[in-house]
């Protein structure tokens, strides 16, 4: 019996039947048509849906298993990287041992691009690609669920309550242990929801959940058996910086953020097509946990993620601007801004970006960029 059937990604023999099914899904074809041909779809919806269907069928006609669909996705990634980044670099890949599989826990800045960039690095380095944890809050439509599970994503049920939630989390944890034991790499974000303020913190509750799959072991031993490697994704420019600042401003001024059905989709699309500049993916060191305190273990992961964060001029310019208006913390050690040589080109680029944003959002946007510098200084990783 396949007890993971309802949450796991689709397997080789399921790929083609699922593809053939969603290629007939009118709602999906409408979404694809609006993405590729927004203006024409408004005036000629049926014609453009047929055009989208033809385009998709051509792209996936040779897809028959997981590997062939990942090859198609790699082509999309290549184009996205070419269009939205200036550089894509990595560090620490040499630490990954051949024949060993890992649970990668990364900071969370972008809904889909975080795991996509980690996956891209592994794919091109010849490592096994990721099984990706994705929350059911993003899977509002059946065709979206299908698309995610076609691309090696497994489902995290966040909308359940009480006993159902507990059983679901145990199954999820068992699945991740099963993956690592059976030579699959896994990715999960360090927290539920993206870091809107540029502060990357691991949720201790996540670590408790990860340990549930091996109740025969102590918490630290269970986590150690997952071969956990912290990963840091650094974006020179956050494609969703304005959207995040708007959310934080609304929480500050109104007490809460009103999310619509389109909020996540808007963030996903903006994250994919928005300008990112230099993106760096840093693979940390595999962790062996000697403690069973989830708060202490979360701090160990956080320290690696922060230390490996690659700072860009955008981070220092943001801190400089906050300092000029008296908003930067007064207890920052050293005078790191005096020693950072910032290019005129990067200054102009940042100025242009911030001028396009409503002034009421500037403070939140600037802290989103400045906080990695501030936290590195406070933690002694930057002197």
Regions from the PLM with identified roles:
Residues 149-152, 181-184, 192:
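Eukaryotic endomembrane system proteins
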Residues 189:
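Acidic beta-strand-to-loop metal/phosphate-binding motif
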